[in-house]
Amino acid sequence: MVLSAADKTNVKGIFSKIGGHAEEYGAETLERMFITYPQTKTYFPHFDLQHGSAQIKAHGKKVAAALVEAVNHIDDIAGALSKLSDLHAQKLRVDPVNFRFLGHCFLVVLAIHHPSALTPEVHASLDKFMCAVGATLTAKYR
């Protein structure tokens, strides 16, 4: 998915609002995904999946950090997430549909915390960005 200059500006703008909330938003995203799409729990059999668990917070922080890394390298998302793509494709073998679930839940979390910032245009740009991230993470599955 090709991101326009406006999309890149929109994505960078909303991510600037995340600031010190990366762990919180990442954990909320995972919790929401586990509740909404319970089949995603199968990839985390060793995790305490209760609200507020240290494991969810830690992994949420990793998820958010990867998204921030993708934003910081928005013109080379594939390069920025190459190692993560290898991990998910070759070792973890995560079903590609789960990246869409994660992206949707992340959009919902941002909408909850920043309702006025998530205009239809920003929403569309974030959706395109999350699709690009998902495509990058599944590119090495082939």
UniProtKB/Swiss-Prot annotation:
> Where is the secretion signal located?
none
Which InterPro entries does the record cross-reference, listed alphabetically?
Globin (IPR000971), Globin-like_sf (IPR009050), Globin/Proto (IPR012292), Hemoglobin_a-typ (IPR002338), Hemoglobin_oxygen_transport (IPR050056), Hemoglobin_pi (IPR002339)
Regarding tissue, the record states: Red blood cells.
Question: SUPFAM superfamilies attached here?
Answer: Globin-like
Record's keyword terms, sorted: Heme, Iron, Metal-binding, Oxygen transport, Transport
Q: Using the record's annotation, list all stretches that form the Globin domain.
A: 2-142
Which BP terms in the Gene Ontology apply to this protein? hydrogen peroxide catabolic process; oxygen transport
**Amino acids binding O2:** H59
Q: List the GO molecular function terms.
A: haptoglobin binding; heme binding; iron ion binding; organic acid binding; oxygen binding; oxygen carrier activity; peroxidase activity
The Swiss-Prot or TrEMBL record describes its family as follows: Belongs to the globin family.
Any additional notes?
This alpha chain is from the adult major tetrameric component, which has been called hemoglobin A or AII.
UniProt name for this protein? Hemoglobin subunit alpha-A
